Swiss-Prot record:
<comment type="similarity">
    <text>Belongs to the DEAD box helicase family. DDX54/DBP10 subfamily.</text>
</comment>
<feature type="short sequence motif" description="DEAD box">
    <location>
        <begin position="239"/>
        <end position="242"/>
    </location>
</feature>
<feature type="domain" description="Helicase ATP-binding">
    <location>
        <begin position="119"/>
        <end position="291"/>
    </location>
</feature>
<keyword id="KW-0698">rRNA processing</keyword>
<dbReference type="Pfam" id="PF08147">
    <property type="entry name" value="DBP10CT"/>
</dbReference>
<feature type="region of interest" description="Disordered">
    <location>
        <begin position="813"/>
        <end position="920"/>
    </location>
</feature>
<feature type="region of interest" description="Disordered">
    <location>
        <begin position="749"/>
        <end position="770"/>
    </location>
</feature>
<dbReference type="InterPro" id="IPR033517">
    <property type="entry name" value="DDX54/DBP10_DEAD-box_helicase"/>
</dbReference>
<comment type="function">
    <text>ATP-binding RNA helicase involved in the biogenesis of 60S ribosomal subunits and is required for the normal formation of 25S and 5.8S rRNAs.</text>
</comment>
<keyword id="KW-0378">Hydrolase</keyword>
<keyword id="KW-0067">ATP-binding</keyword>
<keyword id="KW-0547">Nucleotide-binding</keyword>
<dbReference type="GO" id="GO:0006364">
    <property type="term" value="P:rRNA processing"/>
</dbReference>
<keyword id="KW-0539">Nucleus</keyword>
<dbReference type="InterPro" id="IPR027417">
    <property type="entry name" value="P-loop_NTPase"/>
</dbReference>
<dbReference type="InterPro" id="IPR011545">
    <property type="entry name" value="DEAD/DEAH_box_helicase_dom"/>
</dbReference>
<keyword id="KW-0690">Ribosome biogenesis</keyword>
Length: 920
């Protein structure tokens, strides 16, 4: 019996050592296998086989197999003879071949740290909470394992994966990534966002999709309207989870989470996530794995930032100064827009000018973030009048218009995109060079998301921020959150580091003044632009009232920072364009702007007897009392600071770590930048500032046995900035202050029997007095926003908008003749009608069977000969009226005969003529 041929390796990780075992005497060729001859074949040693190799060296066999496997991994070859990439990247994660091809087609060679840490955990069916800085590949980290787990389209009705996004642009971008990685599979993916046709989305959900990418509001609308059953969901992703779990999406997420099955796998991803998962308790995480990468860097190391101190009335001029002198923004239409205009034609194009050509943004592409949509409209109009190519987008803009504006910026048809924070998260725009914060962000994590649009995937980028005096507390909060040094003016020296320091300075005075004057003239000439500016000013007043407040510590420090000399010094970016005379001019202007006269309004211009008036004497005596007291306080502060500095010089290093400033940081742990959250990870700890000038007292803390209520590894400023509930500093929901947190959880047992106490209003329980309408209104309406709006109770018991049950789905179902929607778990119908219900369901194709002959040709028409030819063809083919067959039946029925007789009798009675038979 001939020896069996060698089998090829089953997969990339398997290898064939048959040739080595048999000394390469077998080549595996089936044609020559029967003629194979053995050379120097030794007889089998039965004793050696029966001894089970006890006398042989097992380590030698293991070493031999390891050597063969290493050789196979070093260089393998596929069936075509081409070299295969080494394992260790995506190939080592056990992904299928179609997905690996899609990954390589996308251009991914090596997984990023967040992908390397999370993909194995997700494939192991674990709940994951992942945080990594912007541009690190978080979208692919949950899309790749999702496609690997779903594999193919399910014949059972019901979606299996849900991806929630806070904005429409982010959902659209996620859809593109899913389509790119899903090539080679038959998975169905739908996009459900606001602004699109609701009827079309009914059809999408009726087509039994596998993956649903949606925003919370529209998905809840479809769920309530269509009575969707979400029990088939196995894979749920919350992209930008900290934004989704804020109060704005509380009602929508509560209803959606209630409908999801408990056995689902839940993933949370964002660039800004707190270490504590208490705020995500509603997500239903089950023993999640927390992965926080680059927690200490927060922003890309390739990002360079500059902060400019400006006055409120000069912000528009400062913006033009940055665009023209720093960004070097060209005016007019970009080259891509000109090419698109010149090559416009209705004829379908192929090749390099066809629709497959991918246009890229220009090297001057800049995003400008504004506070409200009114600012966006005003700035977009102002920049267009300045000659720039501008696109704009905000939340309430029509969805089609938003897509057009963002796509124009993506393809390089415009250089500037003016947006609100709707585009601050997740939007990936390639080759984005600059980010400008026209309105300074009120939260540190919003700044992280804004500047994360640039310096992505190893590319360098710049961020410019305009900081008014009122924005200084938010700047200090950001500086504490990032853990960087704050340098004012020329304090940075000759070699400033814009990537690691927060450097604040002023813009060039003459440039800002000239551009501000030009804008003033433009506003004087254009009434429409003036109206837009007035509306933006009113919107800013409301925005300032409703934005989150800064921390009290930063508010106190901000007064000193703004009053310092370096606040209005020229920024180091302009050190090469200024000379000594310009610097002296700036110093003189700073002195003039900070000048405060000694005389009051009662004393200025008073001479002679008027100088000794009663009002002037009162102010003079008061000044004599206040000025020495103020000078004494300043001297005491200076002496206390000097004494504290002398004591610090004699302190040990261990004591210095306990008495650092608020600005100084203590770094503990190793420098592992890719570890899960643990007690030993790298954290930045801000120590409490000691009281200066009051003398040092012995601490009552026992260093060996004292236990603090806060872990040493907690960075207060960082956790406060990462807070989910809007990052607010003035709410008890923020656990940054133990006293505030304790006050928020206290339980009051007064009036527990429901009896009304003395002097309590009769309608005070659950009600409040509305001053505007002069009546009591429910306090619950203030919490959920249902002021004058009709609400219904959802399945979870929460109030949702009554407009979600408008009956539009029932009308759509009747219009498309869908008897009923298939239930979750039922088998999908085969054929074209599988998209709808039973019988003549949605998606059924109808074939027209009626045949009509062409009309007779008209000799006065231009196409007479063509029509004549068509008529001849119809006669030849016997189509329509020219078709052969039995003629019309002329046999009358009894009813026809009866009708004819009645008609004849009626005519006879009418004419009254005798019959011809009467003549004879």
């Amino acid at each position: 019996m001939p020896r069996r041929a060698a089998s090829p390796a089953l997969s990339e990780n398997d290898f064939d050592i048959t040739k080595s075992l048999f000394n390469d005497d077998i080549d595996g060729n089936d044609d020559d296998f029967g003629n194979t001859t053995t050379k120097n074949v030794e007889p089998l040693d039965a004793n050696g086989i029966l001894d089970l190799g006890l006398e042989s060296d097992g380590d030698g066999d293991g070493a031999f197999i390891s050597a063969q496997q290493a050789a196979a991994n070093r260089k393998a070859s596929n069936l075509k003879g081409q070299s295969v990439k080494k394992g260790g990247g995506f190939q080592a994660m056990g992904l299928n071949s179609h997905l690996l091809k899609a990954i390589s087609r996308k251009g991914f060679n090596v997984p990023t740290p967040i992908q390397r840490k999370t993909i194995p955990l997700v494939l192991d069916n674990q709940d994951v909470v992942g945080m990594a800085r912007t541009g690190s590949g978080k979208t692919a980290a949950f899309v790749i394992p999702m496609i690997e787990k779903l594999r193919a389209h399910s014949v059972r009705v019901g979606a299996r994966a849900l991806i929630m996004s806070p904005s429409r642009e982010l959902a659209l971008q996620t859809l593109k990534v899913v389509k790119e990685f899903g090539r080679g599979t038959d998975l169905k993916c739908v996009l459900l966002v606001g602004g699109d046709s609701l009827e079309e989305q009914f059809g999408f959900m009726a087509a039994n999709p596998d993956i649903v990418i949606a925003t919370p509001g529209r998905f809840l609308h479809l769920k309530v309207e269509m009575s969707l059953d979400l029990s088939s969901m196995k894979y749920v992703v919350f992209d930008e989870a900290d934004r989704l779990f804020e109060m704005g999406f509380a009602a929508q997420l509560g209803e959606i989470l209630h409908a999801l099955p408990i056995s689902r796998q839940t993933l949370l991803f964002s660039a800004t996530l707190p270490k504590s998962l208490v705020e995500f308790a509603r997500a239903g995480l089950q023993e999640p794995s927390l992965v926080r990468l680059d927690a200490e860097s927060k922003v890309s190391p390739d990002l360079q930032s500059a902060f400019f101190s400006v006055k409120g009335a000069e912000k528009e001029g400062a913006l033009l100064h940055i665009l023209q002198d720093l960004v070097k923004m060209p005016t007019g239409l970009p080259e891509n827009a000109l090419n698109a205009t010149d090559n416009f034609s209705k004829k379908r194009k192929r090749g390099p000018d066809g629709p497959t050509k991918k246009l890229k943004p220009t090297e001057h592409s800049t995003i400008i973030f504004a506070a409200t949509k009114h600012h966006v409209d005003y700035l977009a109009s102002l920049l267009r009048m300045s000659g720039f190519a501008v696109s704009h987008a905000y939340g309430s803009l029509d969805q089609t218009a938003r897509n057009i504006q963002v796509e124009d910026f993506r393809t390089g048809k415009s250089n500037i995109l003016v947006v609100t924070d709707v585009a601050a998260r997740g939007i990936d725009i390639p080759v984005l060079a600059n980010v400008i914060n026209y309105d300074f962000p009120p939260q540190p994590k919003v700044f992280v998301h804004r500047v994360g649009r640039t310096a992505r995937a190893g590319q360098r980028g710049w961020s410019y921020s305009l900081v008014r005096d009122t924005d200084a507390p938010y700047l200090l909060d950001l500086q504490l959150f990032l853990g960087r040094r704050l340098l004012l003016g020329r304090d940075c020296g000759d070699s400033p580091n814009y990537a690691e320091d927060v450097i604040v300075g002023a813009l060039q005075r003459n440039e800002v003044e000239s551009k501000s004057e030009w804008i003033t003239k433009l506003l004087y000439d254009d009434d429409d632009l003036t109206a837009l500016r007035n509306v933006a000013g009113k919107g800013e007043k409301l925005y300032v009232k409703t934005r989150n407040s800064a921390s009290s510590e930063s508010a106190k420090r901000a007064k000193e920072v703004v009053a310092s000399k370096g606040w209005m010094e020229l920024h180091p970016l302009f050190k090469d364009v200024t000379n000594g005379a310009e610097q002296a001019r700036l110093e003189m202007l700073a002195k003039i702007s900070g000048f405060r006269p000694n005389e009051t309004v009662f004393e200025i211009g008073q001479k002679g007897k008027a100088a000794h008036s009663e009002a002037a004497e009162i102010m003079r005596h008061r000044r004599e009392k206040i000025i020495p007291r103020r000078q004494k306080e300043e001297d005491e502060k200076a002496a206390a600071a000097a004494a504290a500095a002398e004591e610090d010089n004699f302190d040990s290093p261990a004591e210095e770590n306990d008495d650092n400033d608020d600005l100084e940081v203590t770094v503990t742990g190793g420098d592992d930048d890719m570890a899960e959250a643990s007690d030993g990870e790298l954290e930045v700890t801000f120590s409490k500032a000691a009281q200066k000038g009051k003398g040092r007292t012995l601490s009552w803390k026992d260093s060996e046995n004292f236990m603090s209520y806060t872990p040493k590894t907690i960075n207060t400023a960082e956790e406060r900035g990462y807070g989910v509930h809007s990052g607010s500093y003035n709410t008890a929901s923020q656990n940054s202050n133990f006293v505030e947190a304790a006050r928020g959880v206290t339980m009051d047992l007064t009036n527990d029997d429901g009896a009304k106490s003395f002097a309590e209003p009769s309608k005070a329980k659950g009600m409040r007095w509305d001053k505007k309408n002069s009546k009591y209104v429910a306090r619950a309406n203030d919490e959920d926003g249902s002021k004058g709006i009709k609400y219904i109770r959802g399945e979870s018991g929460q109030k949702i908008a009554a407009s979600f049950q408008s009956g539009r789905f029932d009308r759509w179902r009747k219009a498309h003749k869908v008897d009923r929607m298939p239930r979750t778990g039922e088998a999908e119908r085969e054929g074209p009608a599988s998209a709808g219900g039973v019988g003549r369901g949605f998606g059924t194709r109808y074939k027209h069977k009626q045949e009509r002959a062409p009309k007779e040709a008209d000799k006065y028409r231009d196409d007479y000969h063509v029509r004549k030819k068509r008529v001849a063809e119809a006669k030849e083919n016997r189509v329509g009226s020219f078709k052969d067959g039995s003629g019309k039946s002329e046999i009358k029925s009894t009813e026809d005969i009866r009708k004819d007789r009645k008609l004849q009798e009626r005519r006879k009675a009418k004419n009254a003529r005798p019959s011809k038979k009467g003549k004879y």
